[in-house]
Amino acid sequence: MMKKFTERLSALGGILSLRQMYIATISSFLYAGLARRSLLPSHGRLLRAQLLNHLPPPARATITHGQLYELALSIIKAIDKVISDKKTIELVEGKADIEFILKTLSQELGSIEYVVLYDCLSIPESITMASFLQVKNFEIIFPSIHLLNPIGLTRFITKQIPITKATMRDVLKVIITSLRAKDGSLIREVDQKVHSYGFDLGEFSKNVSIERVISACEQYAKKGSTLIVSDHGYDVLYDARGFYVSHGLASVCKTHQTVLNFSKISPIMMVFKR
């Protein structure tokens, strides 16, 4: 489903700028999320004002009743099913699944030369990245597995590293060593903007430098196969203030309505130049 969404969005590359591709991706998932939660009648106008109205009519059409809507809805349903399965969460929680995932990725993807580890890269950013790079003739591979983070916080990942007070840089070093990669980078752009502008989805989407998010991946992928991985994603929530972005414990609150429950899913993909 991620691959199909990427292919459909990249087909709009001729009429959308990179920023518009990002807005289109967020809008697709938000619209589908509102529809799935039966919140579209009450919240649809705000979505149009904040995001949809900034896109050309052909893009708006496929987001509201076309392929992007259908694909976004399918992805949301699949994620809801995974994270609502208590047995799955209990199986993963507290166990060092990074080692298993890295072994599986190595078997499935083969040689990986570079690693870009993102803090809080969520599904909208990963799909935007994949679509934009596909337009630029990069090959995108979505593996059959993903990293499940039951608490939606960095510490679930860092606690699996056998180092006292491990950091994300330690996680990056472990991944590079395990995969025998040449080099890698840690990109904190999305997490920084969640904590600075997450109080308002419109402000968040304006201030995330999607160019910076993609640039690190693109520079490595020009040289060789590059693994893209994140520690967790983020949720999109709604309360009296409007739509906002959060992850982890801050997302557990009875005063809001959950529109997108993405913080527990860490997207993974491999990128290389054709």
Predicted feature residues:
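Feature captures the catalytic ectodomains and active-site-proximal regions of enzymes
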Residues: 1-274
